[in-house]
Amino acid sequence: MTENIHKHRILILDFGSQYTQLVARRVRELGVYCELWAWDVTEAQIRDFNPSGIILSGGPESTTEENSPRAPQYVFEAGVPIFGVCYGMQTMAMQLGGHVEASNEREFGYAQVEVVNDSALVRGIEDALTADGKPLLDVWMSHGDKVTAIPSDFVTVASTESCPFAIMANEEKRFYGVQFHPEVTHTRQGMRMLERFVRDICQCEALWTPAKIIDDAVARIREQVGDDKVILGLSGGVDSSVTAMLLHRAIGKNLTCVFVDNGLLRLNEAEQVLDMFGDHFGLNIVHVPAEDRFLSALAGENDPEAKRKIIGRVFVEVFDEEALKLEDVKWLAQGTIYPDVIESAASATGKAHVIKSHHNVGGLPKEMKMGLVEPLKELFKDEVRKIGLELGLPYDMLYRHPFPGPGLGVRVLGEVKKEYCDLLRRADAIFIEELRKADLYDKVSQAFTVFLPVRSVGVMGDGRKYDWVVSLRAVETIDFMTAHWAHLPYDFLGRVSNRIINEVNGISRVVYDISGKPPATIEWE
């Protein structure tokens, strides 16, 4: 019998802040399970979840507007600790009898708050002291409205010159509100405050650890599928790789992985996937060479969105054909992770500000009545990587830069041809190899090469030649929503350019992309 790692749990009600998933990740980092729900949950749902504590997130709305989101009244009657962050503090103050007003000046960025009264939330936590010995905290503010009167049974814990109620508390009820964002690294003691709330005030044990998550997932897979056979589309990406390793540990040879080589992978990637998962780890893998099929389907197509759809459609066709060849397969495994679940829920309710379409395998033939196994659906990406390490997958594979689902299909601009893919693969491999040699790979968030379908004149020996152009792209980002182009050293870029032009016959010019996001996107297509 495995330990119940969901025994202690935090409920986070989402009011729409861009930082809400970060709050959840911080709670998970403290070893405590949490879930992220839309703000308008019912009393029955909260009772059923049975949280040890509730966090009210920030949000873009104004509590001074009549129809702005409010926490369900039951939240304040459930008898559990509450932590309101920014908008979450404002709605708590307003709903419990305080007052909120639009501020004349929007407070955004660094601020220093002075602790004026003792509170369990910040006791012994400080960044500096005032001349008369009062604790100071360096925090990150992002708000327009502010609380101008706190509920009568609350006390002021901390304030700034422009924000008289930066922290408020009702110690008896264990209700706390902060006007800043403790989840961001700019709030230097933010993690300690979250730890104080989750571990001390809510009294949650650190049960959510990689080893225990693996034990729990293995037990749940075995309980769900029993002795049945399971099929998984293995791409070699992080999510499908960790899913494969978890299933292999749980059910061994009853798992069949289908690896579709679409001809759009990185240099030697197919061989590496087959060697690692087949030869090294001993998984049962069906290798499907399908390069010709994908490239013929893409022939003549220049539109990026159309290319994506073609690649997705052909993958499903190939996967379905292989699945039908297997006997007695009852379950389809997918590497769905928690952000996918959150996005799907947001899409269904229409509450998300930005929704991207998410595609897993999907589209299986109607005659295949399969159940769905999603062992990663409670996990964030950083948790998936930690579990992968625990399962023995190599660090370099788990922490390599993101690679688009359509692969080189969207890194070859315009029509995709085998010649272009082969040139791009070799050029990109040189760029990545040089980044690693210069100890720059882990200093940038994503780096890759793009094939441009234009010829440029070059000089080779005594002759002139017209060959293709590639662009190097490297960015630095925290969340991939915005990004800066990476200021790589000139001598490094020169070395990469020389190697590509000299070693990859067919490329005569290398350029470097210095566009930020916005206005550009990270990928070219």
Swiss-Prot record:
Sequence positions that bind ATP: 235-241
Keyword Translocase tagged: no
GO CC terms, sorted: cytosol
One term of GO molecular function: ATP binding
Keywords per UniProt: ATP-binding, Glutamine amidotransferase, GMP biosynthesis, Ligase, Nucleotide-binding, Purine biosynthesis
Pfam families (UniProt xref): GATase, GMP_synt_C, NAD_synthase
Top-level taxonomic group: Bacteria
Catalysed reactions listed for this entry: XMP + L-glutamine + ATP + H2O = GMP + L-glutamate + AMP + diphosphate + 2 H(+)
Active site: 86, 181, 183
Enzyme nomenclature, EC number: 6.3.5.2
Ranges of residues in domain Glutamine amidotransferase type-1: 9-207
Cross-referenced InterPro entries: Class_I_gatase-like, GATASE, GMP_synth_C, GMP_synth_GATase, GMP_synthase, GMPS_ATP_PPase_dom, NAD/GMP_synthase, Rossmann-like_a/b/a_fold
GMPS ATP-PPase domain residues: 208-400
Pathway in which this enzyme or protein is active: Purine metabolism; GMP biosynthesis; GMP from XMP (L-Gln route): step 1/1
Keyword Ligase: yes
Subunit and partners: Homodimer.
Known role: Catalyzes the synthesis of GMP from XMP.
PANTHER family: GMP SYNTHASE [GLUTAMINE-HYDROLYZING], GMP SYNTHASE-RELATED
Name this protein carries in UniProt: GMP synthase [glutamine-hydrolyzing]
UniProt source species: Shigella flexneri
